[in-house]
């Protein structure tokens, strides 16, 4: 930053005709790309979703470790990613997931002194656990035309990171959804 004022001063001294000009005509051409969509997280038959803009929370009620270990419905919650205000310039929406992972596809518990051996996975609704999205990966999923109109139905699930290794306690994890458009 210190070189910028010095350089500007030298240019002004070296080009006195430009420095004393009274009129300056500038032709500026810009290409405006289409704006992106507004993406929100909404309830969809599961616990309440709180928050707005870029910070949402979904709270799964207290659940027994036996439910987590057996992948019972009580150890998961449904929600939707909903797109609105999308530009007509986009025909495709792609989503990737980021977060601190443990055990490949599960996001680690960030609660201090919390549950051990338990992670959080996110997948499309009504699919097997083997389809959990892989965080921090180039894998992405594309929204269908119906999903662009009505939202992408997803499930967040608590699962043991290693069978039989789960321990009870508080659980809190953060996942970030990233969107690209074509």
Q: Across the structure, where does each feature detected by a protein language model lie?
A:
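Gram-negative bacterial Sec-dependent N-terminal signal peptides
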Residues: 1-20
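Mature extracellular/passenger domains of Gram-negative fimbrial/pilin and adhesin proteins
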Residues: 2-3, 20-182
